[in-house]
Each structure stands twice: as C-alpha cells, then as structure tokens.
Amino acid sequence: KAGSAERDLKIVIPESLSYDEVFNDIFSTYTSRHELIRVKTTNMGSLFKLTYQITLRDARKEKEFIDKLRERNGNLEITCARPGNGNVEI
C-alpha cells in the first residue's frame, strides 16, 4: 500500500498499565498490522519496555501516532524506527 511503512516500535510504560491491551485502539487507527514481540521489565520492575513490529497505515501520520502513544504512556520513552535501524542504543 502506498504510504504505509514498516517500523520497529519500542514503548516504555508504567507497570500499572495492562500492556496487552493498552494501545489497541491507537494501533487499530494508525496501523494495519502490529505484533508484540518482546516485553522486558526495567527500573526494578516498575516499568515495562514493549517491543512491537508494526506497519503504519500512513507514514505521514507517524508523529500524530507517536503523540497519541505519548499521551497514553505518560510521556515515557518511545522509539519508532525503520526495521534494523533503531535496535542499537547509544
């Protein structure tokens, strides 16, 4: 589909959020496909780092998509990158 884009998405959320459903409505609006591929605890278990593989419906709405995620996760860290480009952290 023209304008769609594959992305690796990493989102940090507080342990109080249910990671299996917390972003479903946002994903259904902005992605044509999303798959949770990894869950990692961090900060002594008080945070979850979620890793997804997604396909954006419209790459031009990537910032809008990230803004919606930020509202939901309390403005914690989010990384959205092309596959293979955002997996190394400095």
Predicted regions and their residues:
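Canonical alpha-helical transmembrane segment with a positive-inside/aromatic-interface signature
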Residues: 1-41
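Short, hydrophobic beta-strand segments
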Residues: 9, 47-54
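Helix N-cap motif at beta-to-alpha junctions
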Residues: 16-17, 55-61
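Conserved short beta-strand edge segments in small beta-sheet-based binding/regulatory domains
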Residues: 33-39, 66, 71-85
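Short proline/glycine- and acidic-rich turn/helix-capping motifs at secondary-structure junctions
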Residues: 40-48, 81-90
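Amphipathic alpha-helical interaction surfaces in cytosolic regulatory modules
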Residues: 60, 65, 69-70, 90
